[in-house]
UniProtKB/Swiss-Prot annotation:
EC number: 3.6.4.-
Name the record gives this protein: Peroxisomal ATPase PEX6
Keywords: ATP-binding, Cytoplasm, Hydrolase, Membrane, Nucleotide-binding, Peroxisome, Peroxisome biogenesis
Organism of derivation: Debaryomyces hansenii (strain ATCC 36239 / CBS 767 / BCRC 21394 / JCM 1990 / NBRC 0083 / IGC 2968)
Cytoplasm keyword on record: yes
UniProt similarity note: Belongs to the AAA ATPase family.
Oligomer status and interactors: Interacts with PEX1; forming the PEX1-PEX6 AAA ATPase complex, which is composed of a heterohexamer formed by a trimer of PEX1-PEX6 dimers.
Amino acid sequence: MPSAVLEKPLNEINKSISTTANVHFINDPTLSEQFDTIQLSFELFIRVFPDTGSDDSNNMSENKFVLIKLLGAPDYFKEFKIYRVTSIDHSAPTSNSVIFINHSNLLKFDNQLTLNSCVIQSIDYSCIPTIESLFVSVPPNIYSTLHDKPSTSIREQFINTFLLNSGSVVGTGDIIRSINGEVKLSEPVSQGIVSNNTNIVLIKTVENNNDDIDYNEKEIEDQEVSEDDLDSEIHLDLSTYLSSSLQIDSPAVHSVKLKVEPLPAKMSVDMLPPIWLKEDTELFVFANTAELPKLGFPVFNGDSVKLNYNNDKMIVKLFTFIEPNKSFRRRTLYLSPILLANLKLSSNSEVTLEPIRQRDHPFTNFFPVAKSVTISRVSSHITMDKTYQQHFFSELKTTFHKNLKCVKRGDFVPVVIDTVLAKTMFDTNNLIQQQQQLQPGEEENAPDMGVIPTGDPDEVAWFKIVDISGESHENETNQFIIDPTKTRLISSGVEFIKLPPNDFTHWYQYLKLPPVFNFNKAIDSNPTCFKYVSEFKKIVTTSLNSRSKINLKTTILLNSMTRGLGKTTMVRSVSTELGLNLIELDCFDLINPGAELKTIGLLTGKIDKLIGAQENSTDTDSSYHVIYLKHIENLCAQSNQNEQGANITTSLSLKVIQTLNEYLNDYSNLMIIMSCNDLDKLNENLRSLIKFQIDFSVPDEKERLEVFKFLIENETHKLINSNNPEPFEDREEFEDQFDVSTVSFSRRHDISFSSLALQSAGLTPRDLMSIIKKAKRLAISRLMGLAKDSNISLEKLIKVGNGGLITWIPEDFNKAINDARNQFSDSIGAPRIPDVKWEDIGGLDLVKDEIMDTIDMPLKHPELFSNGLKKRSGILFYGPPGTGKTLLAKAIATNFSLNFFSVKGPELLNMYIGESEANVRRVFQKARDAKPCVIFFDELDSVAPKRGNQGDSGGVMDRIVSQLLAELDGMSGGAEGGGDGVFVVGATNRPDLLDEALLRPGRFDKMLYLGISDTDEKQSKILEALTRKFKLADNVDLYEIAKRCSFTFTGADFYALCSDSMLNAMTRTANEVDAKIKKLNEELTSQGKEEISTRWWFDNAATPEDIDVLVQMEDFKKAQSELAPSVSAEELEHYLRVRENFEGGKEKAMANGTTSAANGTSQGIPHEFMQKVEELIGDGIDGIVDENGNHIHASSDH
């Protein structure tokens, strides 16, 4: 900074001024010396840099930086970018101009930019953060040139050459013209200064890659679409087209049919004439600029045109979208969703446009003012509730006073309200009136409730224009203007008609109501998602379409074993989509213990308040009601006849059923939907009333992906910095208190939705919402720490370093998901992925390869199993104790990112009949909800022993085995059985005790023997894995230690050896410390000083060598001399015999049986015994199975 600046008064230094300016783009290749140039008009420069003297503004000796955000194209420009002011243009088009000349970041748009305004803010150089890492993609030839250069040289070239024009400031997405490169990523902020400490990483661009610019993709798409009407453009007679401007009443040269789509949000139109400011914005229609020449008649932006639709017509104003945009398609006219609903247009509708006279006049020149308008409420739970009445009538009044509404008979008028605020004001008003107890003549002292704040709208009240009176001559479109000063508004009754559907119009999003998950969008992108929603919608639409023919008395039960799965969200979404009148009742609010009649009266009162005034109607346009009873198991609970109060519970359930049946019989335009979280607690009599039951499950990976998309897009699509300064308004920034909650978020491009969905297995949508909130807090905390380290305020760091957005990085979500798992694992049963890697396991390479073949194939190539091929998902580990069976199962879960369930035998046992089997079912159901998942049955022989050998009176173990077999069959059934992505791993020391049915193909069909390491190399690998995190001395030779160990050492023995060695090292180190302290104390005592404590020595005198625990060879030798093997040689021989029986015994027995049959014998089995067996069975047999599981064939003559 020049010294002249430092001499200015302190309160005038580093002011940051923002304003709205005009923007101009010049893309002229002939201006070869001017590229990446930003010019400001002289007046604008002086305004945003008030601290700069006239001399500084003339010579521009000092770098000046500004933040610029282009307005009107949020698809491409939604954050502020840092630019260096190159020069001042004294001959700018306006005094408030920003001029971009051949800027590399804008060249991809060519000359298709129709932006005309931007927000510009001056910033000080000290506010710009430094970039630590910069990732730049360059072409192969540039990469080859720069690859062999030292990093210091490359960094100097970037600062002094490549980024010279931008003042060494660069950001993500910027184009570096000198090397034809693009900045792919910058850390820790999205834009900043490249310094001598910045780590620059070059990425070689792959030729013919598909990573094209979005705008180019849109151009290609538009070109393909426009080919359909290419012929009409070729045959367009230019002379006829121009002459039509002289004869405006003549028909269009050619009538172009346009598709219709709803506007996603209310579009603001800049620079409207003052006379148009009161126009009805619902009659503003929009199209892409390229559509205007194709209409066949001269029309300009903002002209009035005649819209032809469904053999009817109306007058609207036509505007064009600001370019560039990628949200709006060609050959499409975008209308307000309210206008679409009033015109009853669908996705298949097509409209045409015609010219009219006085096209640049306001609507008041075309439509007469209505003398009186009759408005009725449309029946809904909002309009029929008295507590909201004052609020929505006040909002209706505001709607008609804000603009001159243009309406037709039958039009819908929506009014949004804040229900919480409305109820609060209603209760407050009643309380004030009760306290004052107004007497006649004291009404003037009553509180004035005429002006009601808007709040945060969360519901909509619909009104309908029932009748309009006024002069209708020369009004072919039957449109009238409601002028509050001239039109009499009459409120008349309630209309029991169907609400406007939301499936095509999307009026719910347009009115900015609280976002609701869009199931249709998710199902369209992935048809296998949310099958229960498709089933539910099918039932509802069938009932809706058949009500005029037959009363189906539809009742639906939504059941789930877990809360927060989206039952209520689905009901609300489908009701809004189809235009149904939803009556939502929480059964917790209806319960009055000991007062059945009061409960029934409360239920009927809430329903009759909404539908009691309506007569039963089978008209398809009449309102259709949905009664939704949440938590029905609390109102109609299952009772045990032996419990106290069982008769009262049963009586209440019967009365509720009777009441619901009466409504179903009286109203054919009504259905009842109930939800419960525990089907076993629901009264059996009520279950007999239910016709359809839909079961909800925890979202699978694809469904979680769609939920994450919705939640993240909802945060990133919020309006940001909508409070932009007005033109010529100079606003001083960074002065007010900063509220970080008003800042919007953005997702960095390396955050993968698929990865988030995979990591969040087993979590509900409610849990995913908490993850988003946690990720927001983590991102803010990360930026606060960065701001403190950079000595920059948080507000400046967010606006300058991140363009006014808080950018999520992958670490935010990774930590949020891990925290969610750790925090909610006990409450929601979310399983955790253990942290055991392959490196922690040694000496099991062959077993590891077998596991990779069994599990890796179904996970990476599920399409191979889609044609009915059964996958092998069951693995059984057996062998001596301490050989790593449990550890290997955990490593499987970690390596493949699978969730992990560990099941012990006693956990399944329960004293009540049937509960033990239910526990087995719950374990597998939790695994299905958390898939991809591994279920690990430790000590499987205690869970599933041979049936018939147990002496328990109830046969519990036999039933557990049978249930386990049934569940295992479901696991191997693929996606249809719900076992897709679930793997079952068992571990046992005694496979000979297992039930034989467990070992057949399709269950535990992959048996892997985990034995003891029989070579020194394998034992040394185990030691390497166990000591991976140890600090070993140089004299430690693990191979030498392994040679000193016998071949009866198991993995557990080696673990004990390493643990004892570490303990020995710690003891030895502690003794050495004690000796040092003792010696020091002796010296201090001899000097007459006070002895020191151990704690003081560690805090003040200890060195790092004193604290480090270094394991020596002597520690291993000492531990080895004290350790005895846990498995004897005789026991190992037994396990080898068991292995021989399971892996080689059957094949050997079959071979021996074949040989014996050829010799006419029966392998030593008496002939009389075989005949006796055949008599008992009643049929011939081909052999028997001995006690070891060997199949022995009978002789050929039997």
